[in-house]
Amino acid sequence: LLLCDLTSSFFEGLAEDNDLAERGYSRDHRADCKQVVLALVVTPDGFPLYHEVFAGNTNDATAFPTIVETMEKRFGKAQRVWVVDRGIASEKNIAYLKEHQQSYLVGTPRSQLTDFEAELCTRDWHKVRDAVEVKTIRRDGETYVLARSQQRRLKERAIRKRQLLGWHGDLKKLAARVAKGHLKDADKVIEQVGRLRERWPAASKFASVEVPRDDGGCATRVTWRYDRTKLKSALGRDGAYLLLSDQATWPPEQLWSTYMQLTRAEEAFRSMKSHLLLRPMWHQLSGRIQAHVFVCVLAYALWKALDHMLRHAG
């Protein structure tokens, strides 16, 4: 059983001579900095087996086949079960795992829930833990598990509320600037709306914004309207996520609990970024970046080994 996840780590400085340093999606919320992408494979106990440093503009899904191939080269071919989140689990990657006779347990895009809503409505919920329930569908040798968590629902609604308040507040400020004549160029107003959408993506997708202009190309006002139906549908899915696996003999409780073990990889990233000072990176050459990451992963592996020894020693 292999748990795989990716994260990013940013640079201080220009890193002009570093082939790995690129701008991309920043988990550190530092889009202003160049970064690298770090892949990590850990055991269910959180012990790191493999890591890889990719260029900072690498997409999670495109990196995954390289990870699988490298694991096979280093450790030989075996019947492995890969556990990855929905950012990695593209249709292409699932097909890749099937082609290479690898098993999988993956998160799926939330939009895929619509494909199963009618059938799921006829199924009963089964409690697997306090405030966690699941439903199961089996199709073509694969198992889909719909899980919903009260804790996750509260967290997602809090995030959405914060996004909606921020988006709405910034739109009101932009509309006020246009109304007072401080910002007249309609094209620049539309550009500002685009930047707000980038800043508040979880909220802006529910709104349509219009910027009427006069004959001279000046914006007359900024208006917006929310898609209440779309927002209500999203609220109904808060806390819900759909898992997919080819493990037909595993009960839904085992599938859910195994997927939750992905937190082991997330814990590793948190430890490396905080206690082990993975970020920010001050090195400017790619070789030194590779060495810096290696030392951080090695230190984390030693810490996990000591933790394991102490726990078993009582």
What are these regions (language model features)?
Residues 1-314:
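Anion-binding and metal-coordination hotspots
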